[in-house]
Amino acid sequence: MLQINSRLAVIDGWLVDTVKRKPINFRSPEVRLLLPNDDDYKKLSQQNLVDWTRLKKDSNSVLVGVKSMELFKHIKLVLREFFLLEDGRIILKRIRSKLRYKVVKKLTCKCCRLYLPKWGTVYIHPMLKDKEKPLAGVCEFSLDVNPDREYPLIEINVSHQYIIIEGFLLYLNERRLYRWNDNNLRSQVGLTKWAHLRKTYNPVSLDILYSLNSNFYFVKDDLLFQLLGKRVFVKFCKVMENGKCGKAPLWYRVKRTTTAKATHIAYAISNSTAPDSFKSKNNDYRFIVREKPIVENTISNLDYSDIKKQQFTEAEVVKRKISADISQIENVHTQFNSQKEKNNIRVNKVSSEVLDQISKFPVSRVTLLLMSAGQDKNYIELVEELARRLEKICIEKTTQSLEEIRDTFQANPEMQASFDKEYYQSIEEYKITLELIKEDLLITLIKQMENMWAAEKKFSTEEEYVSPRFLVADGFLIDLAEEKPINPKDPRLLTLLKDHQRAMIDQMNLVKWNDFKKYQDPIPLKAKTLFKFCKQIKKKFLRGADFKLHTLPTEANLKYEPERMTVLCSCVPILLDDQTVQYLYDDSIIPEFEATSSYATKQSKCGRKMSLQMEPDLLFQEAIRRMRHLTAYDVLRRNYIAAFEELYMGNCND
């Protein structure tokens, strides 16, 4: 270090104001004011000083490492949070909304801010040389989230999502923590499932925190802080608590502080959100503290082993008491609980890697599945937009049908009031059912739309004219005159083709027609040329849960429902040598959904007949039955498929 005057010094090429403890740009006009003596200024100009503009030119990031431990001993450092982007840049956390690149890592370090008038702001931080030890109180940290770790994701009626991390129950929709022993939560989940989840995951950490005399609770998993978002900087301090016999035992508490003095990060919880029995007049906040320090504080005389022991000892006592209280509540409520639990509760596993990609909750299971599969962000957004359109179409159609039933009671306000209770409940239930149908069908429908099905057989794609009348294409021999496929072993070919033409056919990898006898259902194919040159007929089939076509049921097989599942499909018939007929169809074409219009007409006639002929009580019961039918899973599932076909055919026509 070279001392220029009583205030300025040069340290490893950096001009430092030792009074204000900050670096100074030697090109700044204030340098001359601080060095009125010409000799001092001349001595400074002879030094090989760092050119600040090179810092920005040499780096695309705002965080720049400097290999000078001596420099950072004489300047002030503040704690700042940064994002490491997938293109290698490091930027300040607060400008994340402007990003176009994925955040790879979140990091925090103590650094010093430098302002360059033409180049903007950069932050310098200490970068170690070989065999150098880090400065006391200066080290980098980042939230260390294991991308493969999985967590229980609890869904209540699809639209409410919770996650459990180290015993803390986090309501993802609002990024807010919940106590497990909460009356509203218990009624929402239902007593039976509430008790089961408690025994499986025991998410009572927030209940414990509110019951502690200490105002802090350690957490190891950084994902909790990442999801909660807003963090505060804290430090531990010793206090003397009043004890028995005049003794004053040593006690540790957490206190908010500045970034320069912080040793840990934490999430602050206001005591105003705690139950009245847990509120403390002396402390406004309690803190969930990240167990790993953000700095190695070698100056502090605090013993962290004592701090952890304090929490562990106190928490174990509180945990046993809370478990006993909750068990008692479960026993009491179980004896008097006769209500049927109607809410739809599901528990799934979700990885932290997937959670890190989600900016807003709730998120559908379809989106979670696509994220887990590593699908592109733009593709996922398109799927979500398609899902919104399908949901809108289904809701509009179902609501219209329900409104027609509701209008039946316009002349009887008392009966309409009774019906409205069932009506509004049905609306809530069918929206949940639609979400479940989306999870069951949407991805399968998209795969069908994208023509991603694999054919039942891999046929040859060669195209070659054997004669002006016969064409080989898609593994078939096509008779262009009769516009149909013909069996390569057909005896008629002996007179219709010459010897060398038949020899040519024998050398080709064509479909063996005897193989078709193995199939009872129509066969899906990817064979554009075949369907182009062959005559097709319209035939009714049944579409199964796998979206493939099946033959109509016989008397021995009545498990299908023909009116609901029947579709009309274009297909190519082929006559086998045992005089049975097999059907080939293009699996990239969505068949016509035949049952929709006839079914709607039937329901409409039934509705008019019902409203004209029934007594009021019977009319009410029949209206409830019809409403339940319209909001049933099978009916909504059929409407969802029809809506998809409507969108698909609309895009095709465009």
From Swiss-Prot:
Effect seen on changing D479N: Abolishes interaction with ORC1
Underlying gene: SIR1
GO cellular-component term (any): chromosome, centromeric region
Function: Involved in the establishment, but not the maintenance, of heterochromatic silencing at the cryptic mating-type loci HMR and HML. Is recruited by interacting with the ORC1 subunit of the origin recognition complex (ORC), which binds to HML-I or HMR-E silencers, DNA elements that direct the formation of silent chromatin at the mating-type loci. Establishes transcriptional silencing by recruiting the three other SIR proteins, SIR2, SIR3, and SIR4, that function directly in silenced chromatin and establish repression. Also found in centromeric chromatin.
Compartment(s): Nucleus; Chromosome, Centromere
Species this chain originates from: Saccharomyces cerevisiae (strain ATCC 204508 / S288c)
Ranges where the record places region ORC interacting region (OIR): 449-587
Protein name: Regulatory protein SIR1
Region (Sufficient for interaction with SIR4): 322-654
Mutagenesis / variant outcome for changing L584 to P/Q: Abolishes interaction with ORC1 and SIR4
Effect noted on mutating R469G: Abolishes interaction with ORC1
